[in-house]
């Protein structure tokens, strides 16, 4: 398992006001909150196909691709190549259907779980070996409803649980920033008491 501190944090989502509050944009929401925590602002960088922020003090880039979910890898690959960031130094934050709202999973590598943003990212990085922070959004119960489900806002109770999960993820950021992945994984993957 990689022990490198992250040099790039990518939040996956879709651009445009109509998608801002959707379940699929959980990764964007994490990146926006992390930027606030680090005191940096995003600016649009066309060469990287997205909104980019450089937290120089933390030694990390933040990226929100503006390519739509299915082409996220175009932005990730462009920034990673330009700054010579290895896949093991990348953390991709995304929504996860197979995890209930309010729960998180931090992991390195592995399968893509049918997530099109991850599929494209892996294609552009030519590997699955990068860190992922999976933000649970729950499953609609019917696979035919998935597209409609992820492109709608969460119900109020679910959104509260997702927001609490984002708060826990931000609280673990100092560990992640130091490359203390095992400690961060233990902390983030634990089921919150309120959901037990």
UniProtKB/Swiss-Prot annotation:
<feature type="binding site">
    <location>
        <position position="19"/>
    </location>
    <ligand>
        <name>tRNA</name>
    </ligand>
</feature>
<keyword id="KW-0963">Cytoplasm</keyword>
<dbReference type="GO" id="GO:0006515">
    <property type="term" value="P:protein quality control for misfolded or incompletely synthesized proteins"/>
</dbReference>
<dbReference type="GO" id="GO:0000049">
    <property type="term" value="F:tRNA binding"/>
</dbReference>
<dbReference type="GO" id="GO:0072344">
    <property type="term" value="P:rescue of stalled ribosome"/>
</dbReference>
<dbReference type="InterPro" id="IPR001328">
    <property type="entry name" value="Pept_tRNA_hydro"/>
</dbReference>
<keyword id="KW-0694">RNA-binding</keyword>
<feature type="binding site">
    <location>
        <position position="116"/>
    </location>
    <ligand>
        <name>tRNA</name>
    </ligand>
</feature>
<comment type="function">
    <text>Hydrolyzes ribosome-free peptidyl-tRNAs (with 1 or more amino acids incorporated), which drop off the ribosome during protein synthesis, or as a result of ribosome stalling.</text>
</comment>
<feature type="site" description="Stabilizes the basic form of H active site to accept a proton">
    <location>
        <position position="95"/>
    </location>
</feature>
<comment type="function">
    <text>Catalyzes the release of premature peptidyl moieties from peptidyl-tRNA molecules trapped in stalled 50S ribosomal subunits, and thus maintains levels of free tRNAs and 50S ribosomes.</text>
</comment>
<dbReference type="GO" id="GO:0005737">
    <property type="term" value="C:cytoplasm"/>
</dbReference>
<keyword id="KW-0820">tRNA-binding</keyword>
<dbReference type="GO" id="GO:0004045">
    <property type="term" value="F:peptidyl-tRNA hydrolase activity"/>
</dbReference>
<comment type="subunit">
    <text>Monomer.</text>
</comment>
<dbReference type="InterPro" id="IPR036416">
    <property type="entry name" value="Pept_tRNA_hydro_sf"/>
</dbReference>
<dbReference type="InterPro" id="IPR018171">
    <property type="entry name" value="Pept_tRNA_hydro_CS"/>
</dbReference>
<keyword id="KW-0378">Hydrolase</keyword>
<feature type="site" description="Discriminates between blocked and unblocked aminoacyl-tRNA">
    <location>
        <position position="14"/>
    </location>
</feature>
<feature type="binding site">
    <location>
        <position position="70"/>
    </location>
    <ligand>
        <name>tRNA</name>
    </ligand>
</feature>
<feature type="active site" description="Proton acceptor">
    <location>
        <position position="24"/>
    </location>
</feature>
<protein>
    <recommendedName>
        <fullName>Peptidyl-tRNA hydrolase</fullName>
        <ecNumber>3.1.1.29</ecNumber>
    </recommendedName>
</protein>
<dbReference type="Pfam" id="PF01195">
    <property type="entry name" value="Pept_tRNA_hydro"/>
</dbReference>
<feature type="binding site">
    <location>
        <position position="68"/>
    </location>
    <ligand>
        <name>tRNA</name>
    </ligand>
</feature>
<comment type="similarity">
    <text>Belongs to the PTH family.</text>
</comment>
């Amino acid at each position: 398992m990689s022990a490198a501190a992250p040099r790039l944090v990518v939040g996956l989502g879709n651009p445009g006001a109509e998608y801002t509050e959707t379940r699929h944009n959980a990764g964007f929401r994490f990146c926006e909150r992390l930027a606030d925590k680090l005191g940096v602002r995003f600016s649009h960088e066309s060469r990287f196909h997205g909104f980019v922020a450089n937290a120089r003090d933390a030694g990390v880039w933040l990226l929100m691709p503006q390519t739509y979910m299915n082409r996220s890898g175009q932005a990730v690959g462009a920034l990673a190549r330009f700054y010579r960031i290895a896949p093991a130094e990348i953390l991709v934050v995304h929504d996860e259907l197979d995890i209930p709202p309010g729960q998180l999973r931090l992991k390195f590598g592995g399968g893509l779980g049918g997530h099109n943003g991850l599929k494209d990212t892996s294609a552009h990085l030519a590997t699955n070996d990068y860190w992922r922070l999976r933000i649970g959004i729950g499953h609609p119960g019917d696979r035919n409803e998935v597209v409609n489900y992820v492109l709608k806002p969460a119900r109020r109770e679910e959104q509260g649980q997702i927001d609490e999960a984002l708060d826990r993820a931000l609280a673990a950021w100092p560990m992640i920033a130091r490359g203390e992945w095992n400690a961060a994984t233990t902390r983030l993957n634990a089921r919150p008491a309120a959901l037990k």
